[in-house]
Amino acid sequence: MAQECWNKINIPFPSAVSSTRIPFTGSIDLLIDCLLADCEKVLTLLCSEVLQTEIRVLYELLYILNNGFRQHKPFRALKQVEQCVNRLKEMKLQAAVEDLKEVCPNKFQREAGAEAGECDVPSQPMLEWLGLKLLGASSLLARTLERCTKTFLLTRQHLRLGEFIVLNVVITSMLSRLWVFFRGILRALIPMYRRNCELLQKVSQSQPMAYLTDFTLPEDLKDFLCLTYPDLKIEEVTKDLLKGTRGKRKSKFSLLSKLFGDTEQQEEIGEGERDLMPILSAGHYEVSSLDLGAAVSQRRTDYSDVSPYGLGIKAMLQQSSKTTKQKSLEQQMKLDSSSKASLCQKRTSLKKTSSFRNMAALLKELMNWCRSCKFYQEHKRLAFLSLKCGRMESLEAEGVRVEKRLKTFKIKVQKALTLQQTFPPKHSCSLPALLRTRWQNKFFMRHFRTLRRRSAVSRKSSGTVKGSLNQRRKCRPLLQSSNEVESGENVTASVEIEKMDSQTSLQEPNIPKDDIDDIFESFGF
């Protein structure tokens, strides 16, 4: 088989018997009893109604947010959590644990086997196949825990910004419950795997039937997971640990406190809580002499400023708001100074580049830096220039001389790095931006005025031409009916026609005075 035969959703079941008869002793009896108890723990966690409800909530959230939050980073991380949950269902861990529970002898069978000296137990192929299943399920659960923490961190960022508060609160609560359940299943699988390996050794000594030939199962599941997930810290729940934690309070911080604050803030909060505990718990152990049925009038000072325990709430809140504002301003100043220094370094390295091959590597570094600093415009411009750089790199490899192109390309990269300085935002009130907008408005107004003048002139010329043609059409019938009208009237009409023709000739000198027939004769028709 392959080296990572456990890293499969469907591991083929061995075509061999599921149980064998071996000599039965007290150690095997105790081992099978512990293995059945571990199986019961895993099954109760997997079949929990709370877990199934949280998974259904996850599916419903993804169904609702599919259209509006497709480019949302927490939504993408939630999709990865859903993929892990679906793979955990598809690998059928619950069915495998139930099969092992059925194959293992129950209490009465173990008692009969102890009397007879022999008993039926799971065979070596069955135990090896179950070991592969447990390895795959544990690695998948560790991956699910990692995805849950990443999604939790992303939603925490949006909560700090005050975006989608109700949605992010629902997501964080759901993820925290899923994280607790999957961590509990993983902690229950570790002792189960160890006892499975111990039983496998004893069965292989008496009835050897090797199913895995090219792969050996690791002895400890915790060491196997720490190789791929070094940050994963898993502690087994034992009776001694539970007894020790009953009387003592845990000094470690929970996952929420680790995710929501720095270590220095946690230490300060812890010291403050230790100082406040005697004040807050002072009245709990004193016996009150007040009658519960009688009205009590307690005199207190200003409710808004001082609490009943003597703490200045308003002063505390003002101090916390001031400290948070100061920290945010300091962080912004540090980021600005660091980005300017790194930008100067990038420019110096850009000047030193001597080939497009080095330029391509430098562009990748610049794109990663812009992405980390959230310079999205520069990142887009550099991504476009990287495509050009790839083409120039291929030409350079063919032997084409590209020294001049490299110089112009360096200038383009420098312009792309200073994109935010050259193009300020739309709502900026800087003097260069205002001058630029005024110049653009003046240019557009001039262009619009010239267009209006041209359109007015063209309308006037077209109107005069139409008027002259209409006047000619009206005057021609008068000339044709000159025989029917008196001579005096004909003379006056002809004089008027000559005046009108002279006026039209003055208005439009370019219009020809020939008839339509003369025009066609000039063309040769």
Curated annotation (Swiss-Prot):
Gene that produces this protein: nepro
Main location as per UniProt: nucleus
Keyword Nucleus: yes
Biological process per Gene Ontology, one example term: negative regulation of neuron differentiation
Pfam families: NEPRO_N
Name of this protein: Nucleolus and neural progenitor protein
Biological classification of the source: Eukaryota, Metazoa, Chordata, Craniata, Vertebrata
Region of interest called Nuclear localization signal, as start-end residue ranges on this chain: 435-453
Function: May play a role in the Notch signaling pathway.
Compartment list: Nucleus; Nucleus, Nucleolus
GO CC entries: nucleolus; nucleus
Coiled coil: none
InterPro entries: Nepro-associated, Nepro_N
Top-level taxon of origin: Eukaryota
Alphabetically ordered keywords of this record: Developmental protein, Nucleus
Family: Belongs to the nepro family.
